[in-house]
C-alpha cells in the first residue's frame, strides 16, 4: 500500500508542475478562449480529485 501511495503522490506532484506551466500559457493565449477555459476547468477538477485520492491513500497507509 505504501508503494501505491508514493506513486500517487509522485503523479500528483508531476501533474501540479504541469499545471503550473500550462495554466498561464492557456490564459495568455487569446485565441479560442472557450476551449482553453474548458481545459483549465477539467485540469483543475482532475487535480482536486487527485488531491482527495492522495489524502485517502495517506489515511489508509
UniProtKB/Swiss-Prot annotation:
Gene Ontology CC annotation, any one: photosystem II reaction center
Subunit and partners: PSII is composed of 1 copy each of membrane proteins PsbA, PsbB, PsbC, PsbD, PsbE, PsbF, PsbH, PsbI, PsbJ, PsbK, PsbL, PsbM, PsbT, PsbX, PsbY, PsbZ, Psb30/Ycf12, peripheral proteins PsbO, CyanoQ (PsbQ), PsbU, PsbV and a large number of cofactors. It forms dimeric complexes.
Keyword Heme: no
Domain of life of the organism encoding this protein: Bacteria
Protein name, entry field: Photosystem II reaction center protein Z
UniProt KW Cytoplasm keyword: no
Pfam families, sorted: Ycf9
Keywords: Membrane, Photosynthesis, Photosystem II, Reaction center, Thylakoid, Transmembrane, Transmembrane helix
HAMAP family cross-referenced by the UniProt entry: PSII_PsbZ
GO biological process terms held by the UniProt record: photosynthesis; photosystem II stabilization
Its membrane topology: Multi-pass membrane protein
Amino acid at each position: 500500500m505504501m508503494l501505491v501511495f508514493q506513486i500517487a503522490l509522485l503523479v500528483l506532484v508531476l501533474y501540479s508542475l504541469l499545471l503550473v506551466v500550462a495554466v498561464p500559457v492557456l490564459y495568455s493565449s487569446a485565441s479560442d478562449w472557450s476551449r482553453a477555459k474548458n481545459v483549465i476547468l477539467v485540469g483543475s477538477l482532475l487535480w482536486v480529485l487527485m488531491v482527495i485520492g492522495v489524502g485517502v491513500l495517506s489515511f489508509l497507509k
